[in-house]
Regions:
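Start-of-domain signal
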Residues: 2-55
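Glycine-rich active-site loops that engage anionic ligands at enzyme catalytic sites
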Residues: 34, 38-47, 51-147
Length: 147
């Protein structure tokens, strides 16, 4: 028989952690907000938080922005290829952070597909038509800071 205290300890260990961060695009003087959520990839989210701020160049692949290799080194964690609109992910194969705001070159039938399996770590929040248009204006090689 468990006590209420034991139940509370268990309950708190399965709660998800959410943290809002900013992604600042230095070359265009703009930013977006991202909510990190460890419900899918808790180890990956913890490594991202420990490495903040992350200052890197960003590249474009269709309607996905992905960073150059980061200092984050994490294995696939509940990794998947099919992602949702505005998902933020970590790409274990490339050591990069990814922002999905539309189809990639390999997407089909309205699905958004990553190049290879990614760990989902959060969402672009407050996404509006303005932010979608803003992300479309980001050029390959732009400097970005996650903080």
């Amino acid at each position: 028989m468990s006590t209420a205290g034991e139940f509370n300890i268990y309950a708190s260990s399965v709660e998800t952690m959410k943290k809002q961060i900013r992604v600042i695009f230095q070359d265009v003087e703009g930013e977006i907000s991202v909510e990190l959520d460890d419900s899918h990839s808790p180890k990956t989210v913890q490594k991202i938080i420990k490495n903040l701020p992350i200052e890197v160049s960003i590249h474009r692949w269709g309607d996905e922005l992905y960073t150059e290799k980061t200092q984050i080194a994490e294995k696939p964690e509940n990794a998947k290829i099919k992602v949702n609109l505005f998902d933020v992910a970590y790409w274990p194969e490339g050591g990069a952070l990814c922002l999905f705001f539309g189809p990639t070159p390999i997407s089909k039938s309205g699905e958004i597909l990553a190049y290879s399996p990614v760990n989902i770590v959060g969402k672009i929040i407050g996404h509006s038509t303005e932010e979608e248009n803003f992300l479309n204006k980001i050029s390959d090689g732009a400097r970005v800071v996650f903080k």
